[in-house]
């Protein structure tokens, strides 16, 4: 039987994802368990984290396990991922050794590694995550690279709790780009598009121009998913039409893929679209929609105080669910 990793949700069947969500709900009501008793996880962070690190460390503890945190280039040696490289630069060891050695010590490995933002054709290969998955003898969990599947499940769990049902088919789901002064990762947007179409929601991707449409891989996944579920997917640049009648507004900012490595040219374009902020006027067009965001969020840049503090905002609940879904993921993978 092939080793099962948690790299993205598209690799897992709907029944497997539903089982994870069912287990996550159980953990939410009874936080302690023994799914990691006597086991350990290495959490490898190439980028900063608050919610991900704290929820994974605490989750491992609550399951009776132990987590160690490694930050290559800070408290651990810099790692090389390219093959055939003459390692005369700053990297001290290669992933083919790192992953295999860690696999002798721990039972799971979590990886968080953002794009370099210089060349999307390179970044989309996700070489850090895939390098760990290729060489690791133990299951690997994606803690956010170019997708964020843990956030996906926490988001869906929060939506199911809000609507009081696990069946989200037919909900109008709007994934909206929002302004941010810096170009950000597309990971959460890629994941939101994937899971929303997978679960049969009618999805609108709202963004300022075609340059902000997500990578074709995730557009293709969305098209495959709606073919399976009978739901719909469209890209829109019209704010009012996108918001009108929506049941879910999910906000995220991301950099335009054609400008990777040339952000000075992208910034004046992005600066024209500050009006994509989620505010009360836009929310008034919806079907009393629920609003969420993965956090962190710059208030009154991405969404107004009134939206964030309003009764329909579930961003805090979504973030809280990270603990429960990650415990479910760790327990499932550790039981292989």
UniProtKB/Swiss-Prot annotation:
Pathway of action: Amino-acid biosynthesis; L-arginine biosynthesis
Regulation (activators, inhibitors): Carboxylation at Lys-302 increases the catalytic activity of the enzyme.
GO molecular function, one term: ornithine carbamoyltransferase activity
Top EC class for this record: transferase
Residues the record lists as binding carbamoyl phosphate: 49-52, 77, 112, 148-151, 294-295, 322
GO biological process: arginine biosynthetic process via ornithine; citrulline biosynthetic process; L-arginine biosynthetic process
UniProt xrefs under Pfam families: OTCace, OTCace_N
Keyword Chaperone assigned: no
Location of the protein in the cell: Cytoplasm
Modification N6-carboxylysine occurs at: 302
Keyword set, alphabetical order: Amino-acid biosynthesis, Arginine biosynthesis, Cytoplasm, Transferase
Subunit and interaction comment: Homotrimer.
UniProt xrefs under PANTHER family: ORNITHINE CARBAMOYLTRANSFERASE, MITOCHONDRIAL, ORNITHINE TRANSCARBAMYLASE, MITOCHONDRIAL
Protein purpose: Catalyzes the transfer of the carbamoyl group from carbamoyl phosphate to the delta-amino group of N(2)-acetyl-L-ornithine to produce N(2)-acetyl-L-citrulline. This is a step in an alternative arginine biosynthesis pathway. The enzyme has no activity with ornithine.
Matches recorded under HAMAP family: AOTCase
Designated name of the protein: N-acetylornithine carbamoyltransferase
């Amino acid at each position: 039987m092939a080793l099962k990793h948690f790299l993205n949700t598209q690799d897992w069947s709907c029944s497997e994802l539903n089982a994870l969500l069912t287990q996550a709900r159980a953990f939410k009501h009874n936080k302690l368990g023994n799914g990691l008793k006597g086991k350990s996880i290495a959490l490898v962070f190439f980028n900063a984290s608050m919610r991900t690190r704290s929820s994974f460390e605490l989750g491992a503890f609550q399951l009776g396990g132990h987590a160690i945190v490694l930050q290559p280039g800070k408290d651990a040696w810099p790692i090389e991922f390219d093959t055939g490289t003459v390692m005369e630069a700053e990297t001290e060891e290669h992933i083919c050794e790192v992953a295999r050695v860690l696999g002798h010590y721990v039972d799971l490995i979590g990886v968080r590694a953002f794009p370099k933002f210089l060349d999307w054709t390179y970044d989309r290969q996700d070489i850090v995550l895939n390098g760990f998955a290729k060489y690791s003898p133990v299951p690997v969990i994606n803690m956010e690279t170019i997708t964020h599947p843990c956030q996906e499940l926490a988001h869906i769990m929060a939506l199911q709790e809000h609507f009081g049902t696990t069946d989200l088919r037919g909900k109008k789901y709007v994934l909206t780009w929002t302004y941010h002064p810096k170009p950000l990762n597309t990971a959460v947007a890629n994941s939101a598009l994937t899971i929303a179409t997978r679960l049969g929601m009618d999805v609108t991707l709202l963004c300022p121009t075609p340059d902000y449409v997500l990578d074709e891989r995730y557009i293709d996944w969305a098209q495959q998913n709606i073919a399976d579920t009978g739901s719909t997917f469209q890209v829109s640049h019209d704010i009012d039409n996108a918001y009108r009648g929506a049941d879910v507004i999910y906000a995220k900012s991301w950099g335009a893929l054609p400008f990777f490595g040339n952000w000075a040219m992208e910034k004046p374009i992005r600066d024209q679209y500050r009006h994509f902020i989620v505010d009360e006027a836009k929310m008034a067009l919806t079907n009393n929609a629920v609003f969420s965001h993965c956090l962190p969020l710059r208030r009154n840049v991405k969404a107004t105080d009134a939206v964030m503090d309003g009764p329909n905002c579930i961003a805090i609940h979504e973030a809280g669910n990270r603990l429960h879904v990650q415990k479910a993921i760790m327990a499932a993978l550790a039981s292989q």
